[in-house]
């Protein structure tokens, strides 16, 4: 239950609507109980008066009409107010969750599937609406109304009022506790099964081509059927327990009515000529009282799911960023732009160092190629430069200041990074290119850039031009087209430092030369750092750094490295 406390604290953001909703709920339930109770007394008193006694029926009939209208009006406005307040709280919660997700580095987010993150942000947050609407508000309403009813009826007969009130308060403690325990067993399983099924279903839709190609469609369907069967079994258990709670409450209601009828028949109501009508009043009060208890069994059966959803949302909220941007230094261009001193780095939850005592100096405005075999640590160095991670040990300087001294905004403004995997948004071609810059990019610039990177045919597809819809993950595009789209974004960006991780991977030799020529031309007055294991046009770079097993083993220009006897770079060129 402690898991729910942070979400209960969110109620302060809609304090007045929630209190107003609670008051309206109390008035609505009180009107409903009063209507049935007064009606019972009114009918019995009218029957007694029908034997010849004078009876003023105007006051009780007006009370019945007033309570009936009050019940309808209160419940109408209670629904409006409580649901509006709940939506406000859920929107605030979604914003908070999203604000917690944004600072998380890719390393943290990669622990979760995209579909699972979406499920937590949408479905699990939606499940939490029951916390106020189905659990807290009805429970506190029931407590208040039972106490108010007990006080009101005590003016007529104290023993009967106390007996009825105490019986209902005992049930109010027992029924929610029992069904909370019963529902706790499968509440978490229901939430987990829902999340798993939605993830599998999304995979099934997104990977149709691959599933058909490798004849794996039936295998995934079988997994989905197993998940669906588990989910349905738990739903069936919940439905049975919900039915049992209703049957139990109805049974207890019958016992209470029978007991109240018995005790009221033997109670002393004084010598008033309508005193026997009070028997009906207490009997109908017992009947009406179970409107309070009836929804609580099924509601607290659901609390297991609410707690499980809260735990899943809390897990995201409590994630800590691997990197925190607390600096506020201004960027000033220096000749020695990037300096690494004795850098040691290993990825989280891994002991193996991918960078070992790496020392490196890179000058402003130079074109640098970083070579090395797969897994040598080339890409890891770029990850440190954009602060997706921080080094375990050592010093990394940007413009002669610690890289941690800059704010995230300053760092992102100065550095543009092309990763090995280009993300294509489910949006138009225009919007995918606009993501390259915070400033408005004209259609003419976009079209020219698409021509330069060899994506002219995209403008001709379906005759939509820049309005071409690229779909989820850019599935209509080939791997090479996705790389070129990523390059187009880089070339539309005005950052002074360009970091490119395998920019020509997946391109043929001729296209690779054209793209490298375009990149070098664009980076004429910029600092360019390219990570690659391909040697095309390598002689055009001002500096070449060779990294192996996390260490810098050679550096220099093309001519100095190619003439170095028994050098790693020279052997590499000769082998190619």
From Swiss-Prot:
Its EC number is 7.4.2.-. The chain crosses the membrane at residues 16-36, 38-58, 133-153, 155-175, 244-264, 281-301. SUPFAM superfamilies: ABC transporter transmembrane region (SSF90123), P-loop containing nucleoside triphosphate hydrolases (SSF52540). It is a multi-pass membrane protein. CDD domains: ABC_6TM_CydC, ABCC_cytochrome_bd. It comes from the Bacteria. InterPro entries: AAA+_ATPase, ABC1_TM_dom, ABC1_TM_sf, ABC_CydC/D, ABC_transporter-like_ATP-bd, ABC_transporter-like_CS, P-loop_NTPase, Type_1_exporter. Disulfide bonds: none annotated. It holds the Pfam family ABC_tran. Part of the ABC transporter complex CydDC that exports the reduced low-molecular-weight thiols cysteine and glutathione to the periplasm. Export of these thiol-containing redox-active molecules may be crucial for redox homeostasis in the periplasm, permitting correct assembly of various respiratory complexes and formation of correct disulfide bonds in periplasmic and secreted proteins. CydC contains transmembrane domains (TMD), which form a pore in the inner membrane, and an ATP-binding domain (NBD), which is responsible for energy generation. Belongs to the ABC transporter superfamily. Cysteine exporter (TC 3.A.1.129.1) family. Forms a heterodimer with CydD. This is Glutathione/L-cysteine transport system ATP-binding/permease protein CydC. It comes from Haemophilus influenzae (strain ATCC 51907 / DSM 11121 / KW20 / Rd).
């Amino acid at each position: 239950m402690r898991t729910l406390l942070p979400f209960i604290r969110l109620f302060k953001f809609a304090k007045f609507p929630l209190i107003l909703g609670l008051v309206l709920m109390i008035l609505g339930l009180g009107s409903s109980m009063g209507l049935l109770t007064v009606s019972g007394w009114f009918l019995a008193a009218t029957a007694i008066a029908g034997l010849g006694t004078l009876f003023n029926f105007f006051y009780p009939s007006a009370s019945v009409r007033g309570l009936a209208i009050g019940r309808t009006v209160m419940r109408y406005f209670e629904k409006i107010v409580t649901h509006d307040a709940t939506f406000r709280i859920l929107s605030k919660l979604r914003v908070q969750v999203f604000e917690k997700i944004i600072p998380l580095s890719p390393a943290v987010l990669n622990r979760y599937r995209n579909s699972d993150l979406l499920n937590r942000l949408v479905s699990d947050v939606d499940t939490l609406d029951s916390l106020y609407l189905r659990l807290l508000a009805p429970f506190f309403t029931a407590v208040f109304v039972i106490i108010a009813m007990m006080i009101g009826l005590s003016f007529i007969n104290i023993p009967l009022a106390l007996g009825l009130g105490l019986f209902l308060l005992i049930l109010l403690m027992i029924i929610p506790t029992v069904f909370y325990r019963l529902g706790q067993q499968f509440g978490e399983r229901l939430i987990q099964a829902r999340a798993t099924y939605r993830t599998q279903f999304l995979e099934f839709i997104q990977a149709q081509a691959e599933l058909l190609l490798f004849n794996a469609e039936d295998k995934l369907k079988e997994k989905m059927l197993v998940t669906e069967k588990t989910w349905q079994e738990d739903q069936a258990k919940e439905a049975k327990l919900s039915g049992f709670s209703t049957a139990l409450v109805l049974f207890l209601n019958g016992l209470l009515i029978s007991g109240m009828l018995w005790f009221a028949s033997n109670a002393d109501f004084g010598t008033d000529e309508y005193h026997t009508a009070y028997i009906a009043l207490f009997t109908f009060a017992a009947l009406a009282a179970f409107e309070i208890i009836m929804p609580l069994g099924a509601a607290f059966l659901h609390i297991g799911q609410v707690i499980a959803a809260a735990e899943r949302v809390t897990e995201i909220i409590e994630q800590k960023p691997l990197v925190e941007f607390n600096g506020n230094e201004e960027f000033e261009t220096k000749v020695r732009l990037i300096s690494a001193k004795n850098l040691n780095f290993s990825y989280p939850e891994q002991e193996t160092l991918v960078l070992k005592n790496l020392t490196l100096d890179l000058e402003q405005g130079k074109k640098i190629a970083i070579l090395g075999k797969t897994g040598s640590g080339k890409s890891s160095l770029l990850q440190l430069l954009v602060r997706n991670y921080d080094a375990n040990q050592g010093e990394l300087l940007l413009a002669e200041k610690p890289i941690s001294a800059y704010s995230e905004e300053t760092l992102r403004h100065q550095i543009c990074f092309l990763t090995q995997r280009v993300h294509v948004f489910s949006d138009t071609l225009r919007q995918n290119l606009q993501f390259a810059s915070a400033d408005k990019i004209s259609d003419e610039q976009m079209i020219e850039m698409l021509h330069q990177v060899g994506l002219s045919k995209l403008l001709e597809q379906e005759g939509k031009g820049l309005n071409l819809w690229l779909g989820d993950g850019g599935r209509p595009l080939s791997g090479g087209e996705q790389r070129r789209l990523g390059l187009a974004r880089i070339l539309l960006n005005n950052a002074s430092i360009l970091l490119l991780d395998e920019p020509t991977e997946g391109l043929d030799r001729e296209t690779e030369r054209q793209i490298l020529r375009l990149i070098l031309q664009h980076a004429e007055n910029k600092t360019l750092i390219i990570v690659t294991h391909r040697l095309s046009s390598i002689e055009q770079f001002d500096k070449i750094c060779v990294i192996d097993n996390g260490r810098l083993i050679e550096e220099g220009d093309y001519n100095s490295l190619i003439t170095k006897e028994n050098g790693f770079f020279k052997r590499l060129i000769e082998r190619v």
